[in-house]
């Protein structure tokens, strides 16, 4: 049996999220669908572990929920689908919501790192090997935005 809520984010997921998005598409009202992913999340998870990574997902959900509460409408939907955060909003201009969401996450995500990683502006990956590189700090990125 598939859960209706994601255990890490607390947001609707799976069939519940898919049904809500489908319902809004059937209604004869304009809306914007935005999907977000967290770049640098894999490197963070590898270095800091899954428990800290789960906390980052909770934080991401909180940022998105707060942005929708502040800048959205009561009919808006927030979910987590296929490893991405989803906002479906009926606001005419979602740019303010988008800027609030991304800005709050990107600034707050720095608190999950050590001071050294923040000073370096990233995580040193494959240290001491030919593949050594700096993986930038996590950023919330718009994966998809569509006006429907």
Model feature map: region roles:
Residues 38, 87-92, 146-147:
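Short beta-strand-to-loop capping motifs
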Residues 77, 139-141:
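Residues at or immediately flanking beta-strands
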Residues 28-29, 136-139:
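Short loop/turn elements that form and flank the Walker-type P-loop nucleotide-binding site
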Residues 123-134, 141-148:
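Cyclic nucleotide signaling catalytic output domains
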Residues 4-5, 10-32, 39-66, 78-82, ...:
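Conserved long alpha-helical elements within nucleotide-processing catalytic cores of c-di-GMP signaling
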Residues 61-95, 107-127:
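Conserved helix-loop-beta segment at the catalytic/binding core of cyclic-nucleotide signaling proteins
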């Amino acid at each position: 049996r598939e859960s209706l809520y994601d255990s890490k984010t607390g947001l609707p997921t799976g069939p519940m999220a898919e049904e809500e998005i489908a319902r809004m598409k059937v209604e004869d009202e304009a809306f914007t669908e935005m999907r977000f992913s967290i770049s640098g999340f894999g490197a963070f998870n590898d270095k800091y572990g899954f428990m800290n990574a789960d906390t980052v997902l909770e934080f991401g959900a909180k940022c998105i929920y707060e942005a929708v509460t502040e800048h959205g409408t009561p009919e808006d939907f927030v979910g987590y689908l296929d490893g991405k955060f989803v906002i479906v909003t009926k606001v005419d201009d979602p740019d303010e919501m988008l800027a609030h969401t991304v800005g709050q996450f990107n600034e707050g995500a720095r608190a999950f790192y050590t001071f050294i990683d923040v000073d370096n502006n990233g995580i040193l990956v494959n240290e001491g090997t030919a593949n050594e590189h700096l993986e930038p700090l996590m950023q919330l990125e718009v994966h998809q935005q569509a006006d429907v």
